[in-house]
Amino acid sequence: MSVYKDESEFDAPWENISSAWLRRYPNPYSSHVVSADVLERYIDEKGRLHTERLLVKQGRVPRWASELLNVSKSYILERSIIDANKRELLSETFNIDHLKLLKAMEYNRYQPSQEDSSKTSITTLAQFASPLRLGLGRRVQKYCLKRFPEQLIGSRRGILYVLQKYKSFS
């Protein structure tokens, strides 16, 4: 298994970032996201908002992987919990197909910065595990690990894009 961890900060309050996070699709930095459909949404007894979405992504695959896969779409399950009382957004995202090639999992935690509550801290943990043998699994994991930081930057730019879009309406 390959692991990537990142800690970063948004120069915006948690309330704005969590709202933009829920509305982040579509945006110009996520053209690979074909659709984002809410499967379930509810508020639990503690007042936390739970959301489960199905994302359909279409992206490029390396040539050596395209021979293993016959499709270019991937189905992703995204679960999130927004706790306005604790000012915390937790999310987990993982693929539900192509599991014979790769299991990709991403976990995020958004909360106000401890140094400056007008900013939002984000902690990201990504894990990539491939069951393939003969060195192919390591190759798949290495490819994902190499591309993930670039994808993370695009994801965060998308949130900022949505944040700016909504600011222009106010």
Report the location of each language-model feature:
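Hydrophobic ligand-binding cavity/cleft-lining segments
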Residues: 1-61
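Terminal "cap-and-tail" regions of soluble proteins that handle hydrophobic small molecules
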Residues: 2-7, 64-72, 83-170
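Generic detector of isolated residues embedded in canonical secondary-structure elements
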Residues: 15-16, 79, 123
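Short edge beta-strand segments in beta-sheet-rich domains
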Residues: 33, 75-77, 105
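Glycine-rich portal/gate segments that line the openings of hydrophobic small-molecule binding cavities
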Residues: 39-93
